[in-house]
């Protein structure tokens, strides 16, 4: 009987092997592809009819991509298909792993169609609808109970959970993705703070005047067209240095530089070692794991519970997990740190009709969906400035992704990086606000613009090996002469289209800008010519293609200075708090670059501390 069963199983497995796989050359294939970053090396073992094994050999991915590296190889082997769903929150890494297996199958002569069948989808326990206010009764008993419940595991959520538990409250952090970090982990690792424990040293190195809190506040409010809430801006500005020093004390490594992105008129932007947000979120997670806080991944909030009695208080949440639904009590409060809604076309397009579905976003699509706002609105929360949505001007024009190379044009203007259009002419004040730069790029006449520089210009924030890696990856274009660079730019397709840059225009543009550095004035666009700017005097020359991509939503839930969420009548909703991109009012119409990290980290820490203690931290001045 056992022998008959064994034969039956063998036949079943044979029948399960994809049809038309015969003729595939068995062997082990090593493929090098791009995930979120270059250098993803995958070893694929094939028989003459099946995918036998998939092994990640080397990679440069950051923590948001780790779940894809761990889970996807086994999923592909089990399904015998490269059409398996990617891992939520790790799309770029997932695509890289699948591309490597596809390359191996192609090299082996396989019929790709046979290995591209879509597996049956599992039932999604988390519904797409959002409950109407009052549609669910508050539980009489709870599956779990904590003092503080934090929803979301990015900058704000990790900071909030840490300050709450360190202030003496039992704390749980729930995150809908399979890892913490979210969009915070893939940002550019740029952190604005008017001072820090290393500020004086860096200011002395670059001969810079000390910055002030008042100037940071002024720049932020002006950069948002005076639509910010001044008290919230003040909290961010004073909280940011405190939290940066906390990170530095716990081992955060930053580059030996200070930058001045567009809209800032002080050198106050610190750059993390790898110019990626996971430098911060990985450290935040390490800090949190050294406390008694509980972290629950793949746990999606689907309802906020608010009582209907006189207290009318938020007392907990309902979540969906792979094992079903459960309820979590929050004895002191729920902190929403769920991020923005840039990936939710149905949510963003009614606010800004031009942000159509075909426009890419820099963010993880599964992360920036806005349900934290929807669910808070369902219990009466108010929103503000929802139509203030920012595009990142320097994303990869072919993908919309904010990769590490898209950070250099953002950091570079204060050191001499210039932006040119498809003819090789400057089209904007490179030191201006993001919205100004994005609008100028869209109106430049082509679907890409270019950041132009030489190695000395970017030496303060780009290592030589990083520059060479960018060239090897194809994202950074290099020419020993301007003639060669023009040829490289014109040969680089942007969504099937090609520019018409001329070396003569590039030369004239560079010579004119060099003269502006010497004279200290830019009569063309009024850029502030800084002493840190370096002239482009000899090759090799470099260019990075860049174009706007939907990035940050400045609007969100209305909060007060305690981070308490307010309702549609202007009253505080007891027990409900929020921090980070889920809130509105900090940035006004436009967020200055590097203020996002400051906003989320500062308000996350403030929120956790206040919910736990009922007081604001000592570093916050009287408001």
What is each residue range found by the language model?
Residues 2-21:
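Sec-dependent N-terminal signal peptides of Gram-positive bacterial secreted proteins and lipoproteins
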Residues 23-122:
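Active-site- and interface-proximal helix/loop "cap" or "latch" segments in soluble metabolic
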Residues 322-325, 329-399, 597-606, 610:
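Glycine-rich loop(s) and the adjacent beta-strand/alpha-helix scaffold that form part
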Residues 272-332, 373, 379:
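Helical element adjacent to the flavin cofactor pocket in flavoenzyme catalytic cores
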Residues 373-375, 382-501:
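An anion/pyrophosphate-binding glycine-rich loop and adjacent beta-alpha core
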Residues 138-156, 172:
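Beta1/beta-strand and adjacent pyrophosphate-binding region of the FAD-binding site
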Residues 303-305, 499-590:
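A glycine-rich dinucleotide-binding beta-alpha-beta segment and adjacent secondary-structure elements
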């Amino acid at each position: 009987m056992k022998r008959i069963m064994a034969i039956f199983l063998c036949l079943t497995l044979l029948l399960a092997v994809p049809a038309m796989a015969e003729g595939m050359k068995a062997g082990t294939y090593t493929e090098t592809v791009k995930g979120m970053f270059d250098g993803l090396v995958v070893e694929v073992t094939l028989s003459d009819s099946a995918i036998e094994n998939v092994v990640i050999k080397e990679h440069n991915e950051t923590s948001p991509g780790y779940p894809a590296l761990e889970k996807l190889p086994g999923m592909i082997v089990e399904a015998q298909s490269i059409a398996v769903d990617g891992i939520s929150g790790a799309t770029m890494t997932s695509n890289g792993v699948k591309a490597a297996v596809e390359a191996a199958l192609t090299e082996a002569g396989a019929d790709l169609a046979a290995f591209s069948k879509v597996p049956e989808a599992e039932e999604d326990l988390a519904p797409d609808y959002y409950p109407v206010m009052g549609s669910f009764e508050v539980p009489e008993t709870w599956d779990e109970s904590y003092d503080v419940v934090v929803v979301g595991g990015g900058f704000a959520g990790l900071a909030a959970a840490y300050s709450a538990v360190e202030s003496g409250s039992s704390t749980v952090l729930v995150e809908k993705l399979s890892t913490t970090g979210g969009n915070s982990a893939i940002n550019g690792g740029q952190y604005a703070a008017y001072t820090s424990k290393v500020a004086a040293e860096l200011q002395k190195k670059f001969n810079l005047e000390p910055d002030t809190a008042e100037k940071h506040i002024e720049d932020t409010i002006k950069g948002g067209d005076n639509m910010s809430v001044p008290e919230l801006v003040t909290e961010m500005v004073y909280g940011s240095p405190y939290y940066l020093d906390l990170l530095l004390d716990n081992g955060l490594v930053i580059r030996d530089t200070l930058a001045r992105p567009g809209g800032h008129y002080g050198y106050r932007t610190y750059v993390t070692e790898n110019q990626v947000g996971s430098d911060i979120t990985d450290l935040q997670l390490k800090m949190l794991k050294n406390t008694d806080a509980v972290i629950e991944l793949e746990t999606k909030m689907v309802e906020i519970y608010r009582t209907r009695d006189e207290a009318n208080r938020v007392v907990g949440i309902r979540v969906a997990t792979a094992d079903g639904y459960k309820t979590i009590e929050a004895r002191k409060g729920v902190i929403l740190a769920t991020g923005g809604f840039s990936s939710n076309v149905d949510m963003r397009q009614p606010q800004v009709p031009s942000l159509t579905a075909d426009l890419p976003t820099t963010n993880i699509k599964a992360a920036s969906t806005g349900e934290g706002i929807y669910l808070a609105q369902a219990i009466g929360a108010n929103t503000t400035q929802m139509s203030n949505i920012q595009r990142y001007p320097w994303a990869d024009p072919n993908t919309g992704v904010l990769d590490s190379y898209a950070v250099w044009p953002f950091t570079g203007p204060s050191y001499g990086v210039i932006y040119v259009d498809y003819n090789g002419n400057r089209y904007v004040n490179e030191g201006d606000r993001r919205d100004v730069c994005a609008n100028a790029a869209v109106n430049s006449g082509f679907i890409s613009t270019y950041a132009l520089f030489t190695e000395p210009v970017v030496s303060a924030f780009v290592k030589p090996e990083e520059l060479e890696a960018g060239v090897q990856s194809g994202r950074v274009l290099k020419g020993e002469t301007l003639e060669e660079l023009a040829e490289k730019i014109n040969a680089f397709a942007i969504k099937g289209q090609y520019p018409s840059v001329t070396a003569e225009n590039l030369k004239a543009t560079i010579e004119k800008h060099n003269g502006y550095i010497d004279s200290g004035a830019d009569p063309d666009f009024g850029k502030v010519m800084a002493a840190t700017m370096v002239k482009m005097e000899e090759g090799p020359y470099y260019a990075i293609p860049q174009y706007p991509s939907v990035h940050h939503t400045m609007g969100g839930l209305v909060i007060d200075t305690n981070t308490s969420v307010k309702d549609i009548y202007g009253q505080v909703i007891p027990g409900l708090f929020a921090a980070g991109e889920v809130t509105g009012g900090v940035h006004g119409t436009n967020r200055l670059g590097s203020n996002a990290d400051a906003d989320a980290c500062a308000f996350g820490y403030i929120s956790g501390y206040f919910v736990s203690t009922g007081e604001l931290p000592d570093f916050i001045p009287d408001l």
